[in-house]
């Protein structure tokens, strides 16, 4: 349908977190430490992986990638949210809104793909230990990492294009604390059914395929672990995988709640989105370091000023 006298929207107003008027200062004081911990925790893991030669393995290569994307994912939405909680402008330009939506889904989908690759890495290490160095050589690791970036870029480009090729002529108040598909589409001045269906299918398909591949890897891993005769060997193998499984559960729960509900609950979606944007990226460093002796040793050496070390 052709739209006449369309006054194109050049900026949006982020209405923020619903039902929190008057609590902005409290929320700022609450959220700022979460964001700071996310940055410090993920930088610490990245420095540990780079500086410790013991951690120059495929598993830690992908963990370092995950730390970078966790910092980026949280930084896409949190700084703007913290600014408006401080009483600064809630305005976001059209171009910045497009960028925010693109990078949110770009980094978020990369994490899904990366969890899948990390599950395959654990499968190769536990089920094929003798061939592990061949299966996961440096070229394959780099190819898998680049593959996750390219897939994430394609996935996000589709979602962003579908959302912003629609005309936005009237209301510009986004009932959310950042630009995301469920909050932006209701403002469009045209039929959004196609964009909604494709977005639902795209997010659902990516999540489902990644989840099934992870499930397949861990089914094979479980069968392999149960065949280990040594109790100590079984415990060590399960311990290696448990951190990854906890991180996967933390990542997939919010995706299902926010994007794959037949009738979304806006308030529930906002709460879960905050947990996904703030708490999830902060938890990953804790999940991986608290259960990982090698990372803890590397961090202790860095803290004691033993920086880049070649460890025997």
UniProtKB/Swiss-Prot annotation:
<comment type="function">
    <text>Potential odorant receptor.</text>
</comment>
<keyword id="KW-0297">G-protein coupled receptor</keyword>
<keyword id="KW-1133">Transmembrane helix</keyword>
<keyword id="KW-0716">Sensory transduction</keyword>
<keyword id="KW-1015">Disulfide bond</keyword>
<feature type="transmembrane region" description="Helical; Name=4">
    <location>
        <begin position="140"/>
        <end position="160"/>
    </location>
</feature>
<feature type="topological domain" description="Cytoplasmic">
    <location>
        <begin position="48"/>
        <end position="57"/>
    </location>
</feature>
<feature type="topological domain" description="Cytoplasmic">
    <location>
        <begin position="288"/>
        <end position="312"/>
    </location>
</feature>
<keyword id="KW-0807">Transducer</keyword>
<feature type="transmembrane region" description="Helical; Name=6">
    <location>
        <begin position="240"/>
        <end position="260"/>
    </location>
</feature>
<dbReference type="GO" id="GO:0016020">
    <property type="term" value="C:membrane"/>
</dbReference>
<feature type="topological domain" description="Extracellular">
    <location>
        <begin position="79"/>
        <end position="97"/>
    </location>
</feature>
<feature type="disulfide bond">
    <location>
        <begin position="97"/>
        <end position="179"/>
    </location>
</feature>
<dbReference type="GO" id="GO:0004930">
    <property type="term" value="F:G protein-coupled receptor activity"/>
</dbReference>
<dbReference type="GO" id="GO:0004984">
    <property type="term" value="F:olfactory receptor activity"/>
</dbReference>
<dbReference type="Pfam" id="PF13853">
    <property type="entry name" value="7tm_4"/>
</dbReference>
<comment type="similarity">
    <text>Belongs to the G-protein coupled receptor 1 family.</text>
</comment>
<feature type="transmembrane region" description="Helical; Name=5">
    <location>
        <begin position="198"/>
        <end position="218"/>
    </location>
</feature>
<feature type="topological domain" description="Cytoplasmic">
    <location>
        <begin position="119"/>
        <end position="139"/>
    </location>
</feature>
<feature type="topological domain" description="Extracellular">
    <location>
        <begin position="161"/>
        <end position="197"/>
    </location>
</feature>
<keyword id="KW-1003">Cell membrane</keyword>
<feature type="topological domain" description="Cytoplasmic">
    <location>
        <begin position="219"/>
        <end position="239"/>
    </location>
</feature>
<feature type="transmembrane region" description="Helical; Name=3">
    <location>
        <begin position="98"/>
        <end position="118"/>
    </location>
</feature>
<dbReference type="InterPro" id="IPR000725">
    <property type="entry name" value="Olfact_rcpt"/>
</dbReference>
<dbReference type="GO" id="GO:0007186">
    <property type="term" value="P:G protein-coupled receptor signaling pathway"/>
</dbReference>
<keyword id="KW-0675">Receptor</keyword>
<dbReference type="GO" id="GO:0007608">
    <property type="term" value="P:sensory perception of smell"/>
</dbReference>
<dbReference type="InterPro" id="IPR000276">
    <property type="entry name" value="GPCR_Rhodpsn"/>
</dbReference>
<keyword id="KW-0812">Transmembrane</keyword>
<feature type="transmembrane region" description="Helical; Name=2">
    <location>
        <begin position="58"/>
        <end position="78"/>
    </location>
</feature>
<feature type="topological domain" description="Extracellular">
    <location>
        <begin position="261"/>
        <end position="266"/>
    </location>
</feature>
<feature type="topological domain" description="Extracellular">
    <location>
        <begin position="1"/>
        <end position="26"/>
    </location>
</feature>
<dbReference type="InterPro" id="IPR017452">
    <property type="entry name" value="GPCR_Rhodpsn_7TM"/>
</dbReference>
<keyword id="KW-0325">Glycoprotein</keyword>
<feature type="transmembrane region" description="Helical; Name=7">
    <location>
        <begin position="267"/>
        <end position="287"/>
    </location>
</feature>
<keyword id="KW-0552">Olfaction</keyword>
<protein>
    <recommendedName>
        <fullName>Olfactory receptor 10D3</fullName>
    </recommendedName>
</protein>
<dbReference type="GO" id="GO:0005886">
    <property type="term" value="C:plasma membrane"/>
</dbReference>
<keyword id="KW-0472">Membrane</keyword>
<feature type="glycosylation site" description="N-linked (GlcNAc...) asparagine">
    <location>
        <position position="5"/>
    </location>
</feature>
<feature type="transmembrane region" description="Helical; Name=1">
    <location>
        <begin position="27"/>
        <end position="47"/>
    </location>
</feature>
């Amino acid at each position: 349908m052709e739209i006449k006298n369309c006054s194109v929207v050049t900026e949006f107003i982020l209405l923020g977190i619903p039902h929190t008027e008057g609590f902005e200062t409290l929320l700022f004081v609450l959220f700022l430490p979460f964001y700071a911990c996310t940055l410090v925790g993920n930088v610490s893991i990245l420095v540990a992986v780079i500086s410790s030669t013991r951690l120059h393995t495929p598993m830690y290569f992908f963990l370092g990638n995950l730390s970078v994307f966790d910092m980026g994912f949280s930084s896409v939405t949190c700084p703007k949210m913290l600014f408006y909680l401080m009483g600064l402008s809630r305005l976001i330009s059209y171009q910045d809104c497009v960028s925010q939506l693109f990078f949110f889904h770009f980094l978020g989908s990369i994490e899904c793909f990366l969890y899948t690759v990390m599950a395959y890495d654990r499968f190769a290490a536990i089920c094929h230990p003798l061939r592990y160095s061949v299966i996961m050589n440096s070229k394959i690791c780099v190819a898998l990492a680049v593959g996750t970036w390219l897939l994430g870029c394609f996935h996000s480009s589709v979602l962003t294009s579908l959302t912003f090729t629609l005309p936005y002529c009237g209301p510009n108040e986004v009932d959310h604390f950042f630009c995301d598909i469920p909050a932006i589409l209701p403002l469009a001045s045209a039929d959004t059914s196609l964009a909604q269906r494709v977005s639902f299918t795209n997010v659902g398909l990516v999540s489902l395929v990644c989840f099934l591949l992870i499930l397949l890897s861990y089914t094979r891993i479980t069968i392999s672990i149960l065949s280990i005769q040594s109790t100590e060997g079984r415990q060590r193998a399960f311990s290696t995988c448990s951190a990854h499984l906890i991180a996967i559960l933390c990542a997939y729960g919010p995706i299902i709640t926010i994007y794959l509900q037949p009738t979304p609950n806006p308030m529930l979606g906002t709460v879960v989105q905050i947990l996904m944007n703030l708490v999830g990226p902060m938890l990953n460093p804790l999940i991986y370091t608290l259960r990982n002796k090698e990372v803890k040793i590397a961090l202790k050496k860095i803290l004691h000023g033993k920086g880049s070390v070649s460890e025997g």
